[in-house]
Amino acid sequence: AYVEKPFSFNYLKTQIVSLLYNRQKEREAFSKRPFFPTNKMQMNKVDEEFMNKVIRTIEENIIDTNLNVEHLAEILGMSRSSLLRKIKMLSNLSPVDFIRLIRLRKSVELIHEGKYLIGDICFMVGINSPSYFSKLFLKQFGMTPKDFEKQSQADKEKIDMPS
């Protein structure tokens, strides 16, 4: 936000608080809403490119159940601590939680496609246990994968119905 001179300290403080609040809301939306796009988060160009590279790398290795912070840092050519610091700063999530979030968001896409069984999808996104997958999905999105699948199907049927 641009602030014209002269300005009062209270006005500046209010603007800063507002910007921080909006950024926090965007981070929450990114992690809680399955289809919230990455490019809607307020970041500078370099940070946006970095996050897109991280997401792309996770998606390219998503089936790998052993994908962890060390492996991701190695692929990206960064130290573990640098990766941790950068992801935490940009997403307000630890790298472990961020990897998990990208896995879950990919599962949402696959469920929405309607081509795969939920039991298969959990393995396709690198989670070995269907029950653990359901638990993570429920915690992240507030509904089970099965409920999301039903909702997604109902939404598709509404769209397909002639008016």
Specify the residue positions occupied by each region the protein language model found.
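Short, hydrophobic alpha-helical segments
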Residues: 16-24
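C-terminal output helix
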Residues: 7-16
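CheY-like receiver
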Residues: 23-53
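Basic/polar phosphate-binding segments, predominantly the helix-turn-helix DNA-binding elements
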Residues: 69-99, 122-147
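Basic, amphipathic alpha-helical hairpins
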Residues: 55-67, 87, 91, 108-117, ...
